[in-house]
Each structure stands twice: as C-alpha cells, then as structure tokens.
Amino acid sequence: MKNTIKKGNQVLVLSGNSKGQIGEVLVIDRKRKQLVVKGINQKTKHMKPKRQGEVGQIIRREYPIHMSQVRLWNG
C-alpha cells in the first residue's frame, strides 16, 4: 500500500539542513514532485524598494523540497 502525501499531512524530513524535523505540508507540485513544508527549507530574500519613499524589506519564506526527501509522519 502506497502512502500518498496530501496537503495538511505531517511529514518528516529525511535529508538536508532540516533533517529530523517535522512540519505540515502547505503546497504540493505533483508535476515537479516538490512540496512546501511549513518551517522547513526557509530562505532569506532581500527586497529592494521599488518606489521612492518605500523601505526595503527582508523576507523569510519556505521554498519547495523534493518529495524523496520527506516521509509521511503518523505521530
């Protein structure tokens, strides 16, 4: 029986900097076999001001990881 990962499931990260962490699936891209997990694979992006008078920002967001790097967590 194959366990399919769905939006809202808890997954365990098997490799990378976040190895051993558990998070909730936010977005799934089945065509690219990638998913976005809450709190996992976060990167910092520096945004320049686009208009005069605007202030630049530093944004932290989750980026997708490959499905082979996670396993469904039943905890």
UniProtKB/Swiss-Prot annotation:
InterPro entries (alphabetical): KOW, Rib_uL2_dom2, Ribosomal_uL24, Ribosomal_uL24_KOW, Translation_prot_SH3-like_sf
Stated name of the protein: Large ribosomal subunit protein uL24c
Subcellular location, principal: plastid
Subunit structure of this chain's protein: Part of the 50S ribosomal subunit.
Classification via SMART domains: KOW (SM00739)
Role summary: One of two assembly initiator proteins, it binds directly to the 5'-end of the 23S rRNA, where it nucleates assembly of the 50S subunit.
Keyword terms, alphabetized: Chloroplast, Plastid, Ribonucleoprotein, Ribosomal protein, RNA-binding, rRNA-binding
NCBIfam families: rplX_bact
Lineage: Eukaryota, Rhodophyta, Bangiophyceae, Cyanidiales, Cyanidiaceae
Pfam family, one: KOW
GO cellular component: chloroplast; ribonucleoprotein complex; ribosome
Family, per entry: Belongs to the universal ribosomal protein uL24 family.
Superkingdom, natural source: Eukaryota
GO aspect biological process, one term: translation
GO molecular function, one term: structural constituent of ribosome
Subcellular location: Plastid, Chloroplast
